[in-house]
């Protein structure tokens, strides 16, 4: 599919589990081989924040996503927490960023989107020069 379409770029999304990160590495290698720009990696369901204490819990053990990003020289764009409000709004088909723009996770998504757009613009500029 990547050979038939002219892709603007890619963002790889993974959970912190080792098995999921194997797929990320495969994806990185495939996009590199097909010359599709890689704008970064996102770790989804990275941790859970206890609402009563604010303490972070690693649901899947110690993450290796950061090490993978460093090894292959790509930015880790964000570590998105396992958030009940995000899950609830996704199930309803409502973007969290629209309904709760000040929520911490909404802010993470907004910052990621802005960062990715900047990278796309820089990539487009470098293609024209």
Tell me the role of every PLM-derived stretch:
Residues 102-114:
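Short, amphipathic alpha-helical "lid/cap" segments that border enzyme active or binding sites
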Residues 92-105:
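C-terminal boundary of histidine-terminating zinc-finger modules
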Residues 45-46, 126-129:
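Glycine/charge-rich, flexible interdomain linkers and switch-proximal surface loops
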């Amino acid at each position: 599919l990547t050979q038939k379409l002219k892709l603007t770029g890619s963002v790889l999304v993974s959970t912190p589990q080792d098995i999921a990160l194997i797929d990320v590495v495969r994806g990185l290698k495939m996009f590199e081989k097909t010359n599709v720009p890689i704008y970064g990696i996102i770790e989804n369901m990275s941790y859970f924040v206890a609402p009563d204490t604010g303490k972070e819990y690693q649901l899947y053990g110690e993450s290796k996503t950061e090490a993978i990003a460093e090894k292959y020289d790509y930015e880790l764009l964000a570590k998105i927490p396992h958030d009940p409000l995000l899950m609830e709004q996704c199930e309803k088909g409502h973007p969290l960023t629209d309904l709760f723009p000040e929520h911490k996770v909404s802010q993470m998504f907004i910052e990621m989107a802005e960062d990715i757009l900047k990278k796309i613009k820089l990539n487009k500029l470098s293609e024209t020069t």
